[in-house]
Amino acid sequence: MADKDKKVKKKKAKEDAPAEEAPAAAAPAGDRQSSRGSRKAKRTGSNVFSMFSQKQVAEFKEAFQLMDHDKDGIIGKNDLRATFDSLGRLASEKELDEMVGEASGPINFTQLLTLFANRMSGGSDEDDVVINAFKTFDEEGKIDSERLRHALMTWGDKFSADEVDEAYDQMDIDDKGYIDTTKLIAMLTASAEEEEGGEAA
C-alpha cells in the first residue's frame, strides 16, 4: 500500500509541476513586456505634454472638450462635422476623412496634442500658424467679422467685447462686414514682428 501511495504522490507531483512551472515562467516575461510597452507609451504621451506650456495644454484641453460633442473622450468624424457646423462651415466627407486619417488611431486628448506637436515641429513658423488658423474662417479671401468676433469671445483666451472692438478699429472691414484675410494676416504678423523687435531692443 505504501508503494501505491508513493506512485500516486509521484504522479500527482509530476502532473502539477509542469503546469505550475509553465505559467510561472511565461507570466513574468509577458508582464515584463507589457509593462515595458505601457511605460514606453506613457513616456511618449508625457513627452508630448512637455512640448507645451501648462497654459497651452489647458487651452488644447478646452478646445478638445468643445470639439468632443458626444463627450465620449474621442473626437470622431461626427464631432468634427458638428464643430465645423457650429462655425458655420460645411466640411465635405473627404475633408473629414482626411482629418481623421491624420491620426494614428482614435483622437483622444493625447493624440490631439501629438497631432499639434507634429504640425508644429514640421517647420511651421508663427506666420504659418496664423495663416492656418484663419483658413477656418476664410471665405474666398474674406472673413465674416461676426463669426470671427464670436470665436474670439468664445474659445481659448477669450477676448472681451471691448478688446474685439479695439482690434476691429485697426482692421479694414468692408460694407458687408467682411475682413480681407490677406490684409488681416499682414497686420497681425507685422504686429508680432514689431513686438519681437521691441523686446530685443
Curated annotation (Swiss-Prot):
PROSITE patterns (alphabetical): EF_HAND_1, EF_HAND_2
Sequence positions bearing Phosphoserine: 46
Keyword Cytoplasm: no
Keywords, alphabetical: Calcium, Metal-binding, Motor protein, Muscle protein, Myosin, Phosphoprotein, Repeat
Annotated GO MF terms: calcium ion binding
Sequence ranges of Low complexity compositional bias: 20-29
Assigned GO CC terms: myosin complex
Xref: Gene3D superfamilies: EF-hand (1.10.238.10)
Cross-referenced Pfam families: EF-hand_6
Domain of life according to the entry: Eukaryota
Domain EF-hand, chain residue ranges per copy: 55-90, 125-158, 159-194
Region spans: Disordered: 1-48
Binding site for Ca(2+): 68, 70, 72, 79
Membrane-crossing segments per the record: none
Paired cysteines (S-S): none
Record flagged with keyword Transmembrane: no
Assembly and binders: Myosin is a hexamer of 2 heavy chains and 4 light chains.
Remaining remarks: This chain binds calcium.
Official protein name in the record: Myosin regulatory light chain 2
Taxonomic lineage of the native organism: Eukaryota, Metazoa, Ecdysozoa, Arthropoda, Hexapoda
